[in-house]
């Protein structure tokens, strides 16, 4: 699988006025990407971030009046835990986005964490992705990503093997004591629209490194996500403090 990155990727930093504004703008950006995709194709495929930061955005997004029955919802990464585990990203999506009307009509494709090993789960997820997005490289219409204070995104953690994987669409990640299943950098980079959601003062230095063209990508793996188009970064004031506009 070719790693289709683009050195000329541009970052567009948008600083929200409040937590509510950050959630609203994130929902609007994702909804706009879905709208654009459905104007051109029968179905839209989106890959969403897990964790706590996007919860409010998903509640906003779930109320957007879109033809959700034509939307496939996937995850950028998942912890290898049971689907009802409190740390499950799938559970979080079911409790937020997919609990809303009309988004409950979307077709959700969780990572199959019920397989006997993380590797088996990754293989099953890759097979589902290949069936859903046929072609040499799966291409999502929208990818929403978070940013860790260590510079990771999805489960591409610095100092692990996952950021360097470029020969498959899904791989095993390791971070914070749990095995994880994650989309790889080539798949994230192939997306038609890439959005980062960054919140909190603890993310300030990681965001500065993401925006620094001299920063080594393997030290800040979020820099491996290099689509052909613009990357939108939605941040709150704490995360964006003292940063130049990108």
Regions found by a protein language model. Name each.
Residues 2-10, 69-144:
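Ligand-binding beta-strand-loop-alpha-helix segment within the catalytic cores
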Residues 60-68, 91, 158-166, 213:
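A glycine- and small-aliphatic-rich helix-loop capping segment at beta-alpha/alpha-beta transitions
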Residues 142-186:
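Class I SAM-dependent methyltransferase SAM-binding "motif I" and its flanking Rossmann-like core
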């Amino acid at each position: 699988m070719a790693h289709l990155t683009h050195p000329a990727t541009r970052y567009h930093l948008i600083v929200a006025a409040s937590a509510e504004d950050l959630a609203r703008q994130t929902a609007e950006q994702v909804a706009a990407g879905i709208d654009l995709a459905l104007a051109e194709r029968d179905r839209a495929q989106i890959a969403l971030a897990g964790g706590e930061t996007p919860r409010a955005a998903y509640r906003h997004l779930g109320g957007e009046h879109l033809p959700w029955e034509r939307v496939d919802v996937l995850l950028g990464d998942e912890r290898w835990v049971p689907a009802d585990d409190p740390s499950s990203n799938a559970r979080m999506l079911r409790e937020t986005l997919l609990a809303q009307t009309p988004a409950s009509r979307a077709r959700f494709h969780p990572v199959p964490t019920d397989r006997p090993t993380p590797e088996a789960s990754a293989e099953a997820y890759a097979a589902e992705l290949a069936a859903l997005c046929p072609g040499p490289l799966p291409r999502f219409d929208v990818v929403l990503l978070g940013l860790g204070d260590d510079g990771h995104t999805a489960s591409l953690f610095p100092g692990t093997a996952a950021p360097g994987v470029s020969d498959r669409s899904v791989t095993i990640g390791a971070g914070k004591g749990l095995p994880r299943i994650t989309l790889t950098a080539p798949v994230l980079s192939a997306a038609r629209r890439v959005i980062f959601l960054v919140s909190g003062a603890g993310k300030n230095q990681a965001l500065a490194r993401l925006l620094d063209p001299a920063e080594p990508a393997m030290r800040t793996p979020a820099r491996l996500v290099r689509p052909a188009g613009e990357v939108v970064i939605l941040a709150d004031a704490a995360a964006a403090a003292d940063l130049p506009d990108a």
